[in-house]
Each structure stands twice: as structure tokens, then as C-alpha cells.
């Protein structure tokens, strides 16, 4: 016998399937009829518009005064050099929002993306071509790299950087493609429930799972404006009292993460037992764990990234608060 519903059915399952390093399929279900597309469409928009990426915003080239100049011994005109630089995908190491990176190359040689890697930045597009110089050329330049969202034209950047820099159109978005499908599914003999299936592809600056988490976090943040009036902070996630799926993931024990003995022992000696404890820590706090070496830190950071919780990201406040309460209960 059917029952009268007082609230919409709440989805309970999330599945993540890695298709490649830069592509993933994320499914959530079951939604009541019409609810899947209601959430899927804005999430797609947010993924494409609000994911944080990194881009070169300006370059200063020794011997070049403007973008229409040319350099003796360099095959490319400065304009082509700037276009090539714009197409190289960088990652800033650490928490900095902006870095200025300096380079100097002697010819003859081809300069590619991989040649721009140093302690401050990594490069995703390692094979991307930047310039070809001959033996007469010493190419010296500095690049301003900035984290951001969306797009900023060079005209706006010109007012921000110094007059000796050539501004560059900044395409920050790390998400290359997002598509979603709404599939019908059967729940307790009712065929009118839905599954939202996303396919997310990034350029390698961030993982698809991280991009998806950021989009969900932005949606939470935008909706929080209503909390000023309606006090939604104590609204229950489900009438059954079940924990959110994300919270269940965050209370996985660290000894179930398949870390090396060295990394596990460092965390264990620090009293860390659950994944969520690491996720709540800042990058500096993780690095400062006693007896945690660089190799162990890199392993832990890679593990957190693969799980969709990179060390430089923060949880939505409602999830973080619920996680702290849960951890207190588990460690009591």
C-alpha cells in the first residue's frame, strides 16, 4: 500500500568511476522524478564556470617591449610566443594564489612545457611547444601565474600588472568537458526514480573528482545566503538519521588507506586514526606532523587527491562541523 509523502525522497548513493587520470564518471541516485535534472544542470554550469585553475596572466621578456616585437635568434615572434605560453597548463605548488617565475634558456634548443617545471610550479602539458631558439639567443623571461576562475581578458589584466609586462588573456577553467545523463531506475517496484550520471573531464590541473567537489561546495555556499533568515543550519539531512554519504567516507580508518608503513606509523604516532582528521588539516599542519618526511607527505597528498580531498581544499562548513562532531564521538 502506498504511503503519503511529506518530503521528497532523498538520494543515498554516490558512485565514482575513474575513466582516466583526467576523466571520471560520477553517479548519484535515486532521485524522485524531476529532481535529478534540477540538480544536474546547475552543477554542470558551476563545474564549467567556477572551478579554480591556474593560468599565466602576464610575461616580461628581456629585449621585447610589446607583444608585436621579435627577438633575434628566436623562431617565433613574441605574439606567437605569448599564444604558446597561454596554451601551457601550469599548477602552482603550495597555497600561494600568485607566483612570479623566472626563466633563462641558451640556444640552440626547443623549449617545451616540461622545461618550465621548478620548485614553485608544475606543468601538466609537458610536451607543449613554447619556442625554438638558436645559438645566438639567450631567452630570459618572467611569468606571472595566477589562480582564479572563469576568464579575464588581457585588457583588464593590463591595469593589474606592471607596464613592463605583456598581459595575457587568462583562461582559468580547468574543466574541459561536462556532460550528464538522466537515467530512469527502479526503486521498490516504482520505475519513476532517476539516476544522475556525470562525465567530467579536466585538463590535469585538478582531478575530475576535486572539480566536482568544488562545484558542490560552491552550490552549498551560494544557498547559504538563505540561512541568514531561515536558520537552516539545523535542518536534518534525512528523517532516518542516516549520515551523509560524504561523512561516511571521511570516517574511514587510516589503516584502511593502504599507505606505506612509514607513512602510517607517522600518522599513528601523531594520534591520527581517521581520514577525516587529515582532511580537516591545512597543508602546513600536515607537513608539520612530527617525523613525517617529504616522501611520506607526497604519498599522503597523492592519496588524498585520489580520494577527492586534496590537502589545499577545505570542506563545506556544514560537512566540516558534522565531521568534527562525529570524530569526537568516535575518539571519545
UniProtKB/Swiss-Prot annotation:
Keywords recorded for this protein, A-Z: DNA-directed RNA polymerase, Nucleotidyltransferase, Transcription, Transferase
E.C. no: 2.7.7.6
Catalytic activity: RNA(n) + a ribonucleoside 5'-triphosphate = RNA(n+1) + diphosphate
Any GO BP annotation: DNA-templated transcription
GO cellular component annotations of the record: cytoplasm; DNA-directed RNA polymerase complex
The keyword Metal-binding belongs to this UniProt entry's keyword annotation: no
UniProt region (Alpha N-terminal domain (alpha-NTD)), positions on chain: 1-227
Enzyme class, broadest EC rank: transferase
InterPro entries xrefs: DNA-dir_RNA_pol_insert (IPR011262), DNA-dir_RNA_pol_RpoA/D/Rpb3 (IPR011263), DNA-dir_RpoA (IPR011773), RBP11-like (IPR036603), RNAP_asu_C (IPR011260), RNApol_insert_sf (IPR036643)
Region (Alpha C-terminal domain (alpha-CTD)) location: 248-332
Example of a GO MF term: DNA binding
Taxonomy, superkingdom: Bacteria
Subunit text: Homodimer. The RNAP catalytic core consists of 2 alpha, 1 beta, 1 beta' and 1 omega subunit. When a sigma factor is associated with the core the holoenzyme is formed, which can initiate transcription.
Role noted for this protein: DNA-dependent RNA polymerase catalyzes the transcription of DNA into RNA using the four ribonucleoside triphosphates as substrates.
Family to which the UniProt record says this protein belongs: Belongs to the RNA polymerase alpha chain family.
Notes concerning its domains: The N-terminal domain is essential for RNAP assembly and basal transcription, whereas the C-terminal domain is involved in interaction with transcriptional regulators and with upstream promoter elements.
Record protein name field: DNA-directed RNA polymerase subunit alpha
Organism whose genome encodes this protein: Aliarcobacter butzleri (strain RM4018)
Amino acid at each position: 500500500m502506498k504511503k503519503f509523502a511529506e518530503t521528497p525522497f532523498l538520494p543515498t548513493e554516490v558512485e565514482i568511476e575513474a575513466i582516466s587520470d583526467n576523466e571520471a564518471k560520477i553517479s548519484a541516485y535515486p532521485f524522485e522524478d524531476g529532481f535529478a535534472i534540477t540538480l544536474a544542470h546547475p552543477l554542470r554550469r558551476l563545474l564549467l564556470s567556477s572551478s579554480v585553475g591556474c593560468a599565466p596572466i602576464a610575461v616580461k621578456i628581456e629585449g621585447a617591449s610589446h607583444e608585436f616585437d621579435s627577438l633575434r635568434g628566436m623562431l617565433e615572434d613574441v605574439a606567437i610566443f605569448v599564444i604558446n605560453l597561454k596554451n601551457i597548463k601550469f599548477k602552482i605548488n603550495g597555497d600561494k594564489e600568485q607566483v612570479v617565475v623566472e626563466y633563462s634558456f641558451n640556444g640552440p634548443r626547443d623549449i617545451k612545457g616540461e622545461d618550465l617545471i621548478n620548485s614553485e610550479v608544475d606543468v601538466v602539458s609537458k610536451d607543449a611547444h613554447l619556442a625554438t631558439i638558436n645559438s645566438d639567443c639567450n631567452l630570459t623571461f618572467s611569468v606571472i601565474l595566477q589562480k582564479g576562475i572563469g576568464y579575464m581578458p588581457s585588457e583588464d589584466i593590463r591595469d593589474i600588472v606592471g607596464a613592463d609586462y605583456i598581459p595575457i588573456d587568462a583562461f582559468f577553467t580547468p574543466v574541459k568537458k561536462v556532460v550528464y545523463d538522466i537515467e530512469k531506475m527502479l526503486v521498490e517496484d516504482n520505475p519513476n526514480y532517476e539516476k544522475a550520471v556525470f562525465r567530467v573531464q579536466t585538463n590535469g590541473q585538478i582531478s575530475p573528482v576535486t572539480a566536482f567537489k568544488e562545484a558542490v561546495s560552491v552550490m552549498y555556499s551560494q544557498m547559504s545566503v538563505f540561512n541568514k533568515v531561515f536558520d537552516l543550519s539545523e535542518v536534518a539531512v534525512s528523517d532516518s538519521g542516516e549520515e551523509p554519504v560524504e561523512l561516511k567516507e571521511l570516517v574511514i580508518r587510516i589503516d584502511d588507506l593502504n599507505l606505506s608503513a612509514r607513512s602510517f606509523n607517522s600518522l599513528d604516532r601523531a594520534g591520527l586514526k581517521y581520514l577525516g582528521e587529515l582532511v580537516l588539516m591545512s597543508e602546513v599542519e600536515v607537513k608539520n606532523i612530527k617525523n613525517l618526511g617529504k616522501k611520506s607527505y607526497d604519498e599522503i597528498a597523492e592519496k588524498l587527491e585520489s580520494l577527492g580531498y586534496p590537502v589545499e581544499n577545505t570542506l563545506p562548513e556544514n560537512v566540516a562541523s558534522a565531521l568534527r562532531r562525529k570524530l569526537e564521538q568516535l575518539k571519545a
